[in-house]
């Protein structure tokens, strides 16, 4: 057995956003909303604006993906402003925006525009170094697609075909290599009409522009395609004499990556992710000096036969390869690879009629075989009978060659780390590795429906939707929060479509729905904290996690104190910087109330309770020109003042900023979300948990020692499964308690699974990465001020100003 590091095709890119913003201008082109509000798919192919960006505006590169186009220009281009102004007048159906430095430095803007790990930005920069307008013959770029010419061949008709290596950045920051070819058309037969430049035998990719073919360029390679649009070509000059024609794909690719790394060095650092590879077989004559390697071995079966087989298997490995430490583990170390031992058996489920049928929707068992070893395979290797186990021969060394030949293809699978990745189309789960959990940013939209009277027909009721949008970027562990409803103006096409999809789902399924926008999949992840730590639990699904923005949740510790001078200085500075007269008057009135209370009590440090009481005693500032409405009722007058409206939000954000995150009031729309979270109502709303499903005994069999979450499936007309607390998470409730790694280990050991009744459940992974964030949020929730019972009906929706 030998180990070495091999370079994968996964890219790790570290960007210098300030340098990019300093030297480049990035242009964003998006289609405008249609006047009739229709949600038809918009295509850029009907308009040559992408070609104009390259031909007329001289963009270094442009990339098109998911309904938007981006182009990159050198900052020193003085004519760019005039060209963009002309484009805006000519192409009125597009939004043409220049990304400023603040947008480029914002992680949320980058996530929305460039995707996970800024994939599109990497593709844009890579494409910019091989602009096909130059005389460089080595690399060519069309709309972000990178082609490395390798060889020119002639077909039977005498036409040349240029074989190219196509480089693209795929999801997950993997560099994908494929081979495609372009065919030359006889220049004498070039029609006056427009041309498509396409891959041979394929129409998958748009590669065009609007220029005519210069007659002097006899070696241009392109394919003719009847089209009413105008497109360009790639000038592949005659490269048949190049010595690099017969180079390998990898060599050609690495040549390009080395060049790109040098030219982009001031703006980003590109590196390949390396992984360890273990080769099982004869020992090397001169094995490299390696550090001790460790592996997790998890017995998912936990039967007497599996214990016996595991012991024999591990003894064999220890005898043959003493330099490696492979031991059974009760706690999986997420830093090292894991090998699973599981059953190779069939699984069953209930159909709609309640009959027990084989579940053929679990092809992930085949995937397990690529990541682990079945008990049946080990029994066959060691000649153990599955019905009546017997010990193999004592002399294991005599069977070394036979075992080596059998184990080599099995243990070679250790080169891959265990990951859980859900195949969305097949609805399947594979093996889980904590490090890979939540590796991509996602946008989560939680709808909440409200029944209203139909104004057109008072006898009927209609459903109205409120939405809470959360955007999380695991790379920065930052969360954005936004509230809107179906009547909100300025919704994007994607959000408008999401509203319609949500309505359709409610009409069809009668259940709550979470929509993960960037994958168009159902997202079923809910966090359910109870009234005390022992009652807290999570229902979570692969690659999903619902966590409110804890910086915007009401986290105020009312006993927290701030020096009076520091607070008053902050008030005066905020008043001086603001240009809003009402906001300034609100701040002045609030500061006067605080100063009066300070003088009355003779304090040097002011508590948040005092600051909050002072605000409740101030009167709202109203413009003299404001229309006077109906007089407030006595009940309304008796309610304590809250931070409502736009001004209230500014005041709340101001005091939260001054007190380092201690917000006094709940911002707009979040109180309902808070209520649902604390009362665990989200689970009660029949969240749709996906297949695969398992029975209790099968859950016992699949328990892997890490701790997982299982949630009850939704009810149907025949089977009704009550809401069940499947797992509980023990978290600290003491304030300011530091969560250490030792405490994490304690939590893992305390994870217990409770089976309420025999039924089928959905197996879900435990969110290791965000346990710390959940603990912080849970502790913050303990400090929330509980309103009096007679104030529970108080309206919490802020008035728009």
Predicted regions: what they are:
Residues 1-241, 248-256, 260-269, 274-275, ...:
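Long, contiguous domain-sized segments
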């Amino acid at each position: 057995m030998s180990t070495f590091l091999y370079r994968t095709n996964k890219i790790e890119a570290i960007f210098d956003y300030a340098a990019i913003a300093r030297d480049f201008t990035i242009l964003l082109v998006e289609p405008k909303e249609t006047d009739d509000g229709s949600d038809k798919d918009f295509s850029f192919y009907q308009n040559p604006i992408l070609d104009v960006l390259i031909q007329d505006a001289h963009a270094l590169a442009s990339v098109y993906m998911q309904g938007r186009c981006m182009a990159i220009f050198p900052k020193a281009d003085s004519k760019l402003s005039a060209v963009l102004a002309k484009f805006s007048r000519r192409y009125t159906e597009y939004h043409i925006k220049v990304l400023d430095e603040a947008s480029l430095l914002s992680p949320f803007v980058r996530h929305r525009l460039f995707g996970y790990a800024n994939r599109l930005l990497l593709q844009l920069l890579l494409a910019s170094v091989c602009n096909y307008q130059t005389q460089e013959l080595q690399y060519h770029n069309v709309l972000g697609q990178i082609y490395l010419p390798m060889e020119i061949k002639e077909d039977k008709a005498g036409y040349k075909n240029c074989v190219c290596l196509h480089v693209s950045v795929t999801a997950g920051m993997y560099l994908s290599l494929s081979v495609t070819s372009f065919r030359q058309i006889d220049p004498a037969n070039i029609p006056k009409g427009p041309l498509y430049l396409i891959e041979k035998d394929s129409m998958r990719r748009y590669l065009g522009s609007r220029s005519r073919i210069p007659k002097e360029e006899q070696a241009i390679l392109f394919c003719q395609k009847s089209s009413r649009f105008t497109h360009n070509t790639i000038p592949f000059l005659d490269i048949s004499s190049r010595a690099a024609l017969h180079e390998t794909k990898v060599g050609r690719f690495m040549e390009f990556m080395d060049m790109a790394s040098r030219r982009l060095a001031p703006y980003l650092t590109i590196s390949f992710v390396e992984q360890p590879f273990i080769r099982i077989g004869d020992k090397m004559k001169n094995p490299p000096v390696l550090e001790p390697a460790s592996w997790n071995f998890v017995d998912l079966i936990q039967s007497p036969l599996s214990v016996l087989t595991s012991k024999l298997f591990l003894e064999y490995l220890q005898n043959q390869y003493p330099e490696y430490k492979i031991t059974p583990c009760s706690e999986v170390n997420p830093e090292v690879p894991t090998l699973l031992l599981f059953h190779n058996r069939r699984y069953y489920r209930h159909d709609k009629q309640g009959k027990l049928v084989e579940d053929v929707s679990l092809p992930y068992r085949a995937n397990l075989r690529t990541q682990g070893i079945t008990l049946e395979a080990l029994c066959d290797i060691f000649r153990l009978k599955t019905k009546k186990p017997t010990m193999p021969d004592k002399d294991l060394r005599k069977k070394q060659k036979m075992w080596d030949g059998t184990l080599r293809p099995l243990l070679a699978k250790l080169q891959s780390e265990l990951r859980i990745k859900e195949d969305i189309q097949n609805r399947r789960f594979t093996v889980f590795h904590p490090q890979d959990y939540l590796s991509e940013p996602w946008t989560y939209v939680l709808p909440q429906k409200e029944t209203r009277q139909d104004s057109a027909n008072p006898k009927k009721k209609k459903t109205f939707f409120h939405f809470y949008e959360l955007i999380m970027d695991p790379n920065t562990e930052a969360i954005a929060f936004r509230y809107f409803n179906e009547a909100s103006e300025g919704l994007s096409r994607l959000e408008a479509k999401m509203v319609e999809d949500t309505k359709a789902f409610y009409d069809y399924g009668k259940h709550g729905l979470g929509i993960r926008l960037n994958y168009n999949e159902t997202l079923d992840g809910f966090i359910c904290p109870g009234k005390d730590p022992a009652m807290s639990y999570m229902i979570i699904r692969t690659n999903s996690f619902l966590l409110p923005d804890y910086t915007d949740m009401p986290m105020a510790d009312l006993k927290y104190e701030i020096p009076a001078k520091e607070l008053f200085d902050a008030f005066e500075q905020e008043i001086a910087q603001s240009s809003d007269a009402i906001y300034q008057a609100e701040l002045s009135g609030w500061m006067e109330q605080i100063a009066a209370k300070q003088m009355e009590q003779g304090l040097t440090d002011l508590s948040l309770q005092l600051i909050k009481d002072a605000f409740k005693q101030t009167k709202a500032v109203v413009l003299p020109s404001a229309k006077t409405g109906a007089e407030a009722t006595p009940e309304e007058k008796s309610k304590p003042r809250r931070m409502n409206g736009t001004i209230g939000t500014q005041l709340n954000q101001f005091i939260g900023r001054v007190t380092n995150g201690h917000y006094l009031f709940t911002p707009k729309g979040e109180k309902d979300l808070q209520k649902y979270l604390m009362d665990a109502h989200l689970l009660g709303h029949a969240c749709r948990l996906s297949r695969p499903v398992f029975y209790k005994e099968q859950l016992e069999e699949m328990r892997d020692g890490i701790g997982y979450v299982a949630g009850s499936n939704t009810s149907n007309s025949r089977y009704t499964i009550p809401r069940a607390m499947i797992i509980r998470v023990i978290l600290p409730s003491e304030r300011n308690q530091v969560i250490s790694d030792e405490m994490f280990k304690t939590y893992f050991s305390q994870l217990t699974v409770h089976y309420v009744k025999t039924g089928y459940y959905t197996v879900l992974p435990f969110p290791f990465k965000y346990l710390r964030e959940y603990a912080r949020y849970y502790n913050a929730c303990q400090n929330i001020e509980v309103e009096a019972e007679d104030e529970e009906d108080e309206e919490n929706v802020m008035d728009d100003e």
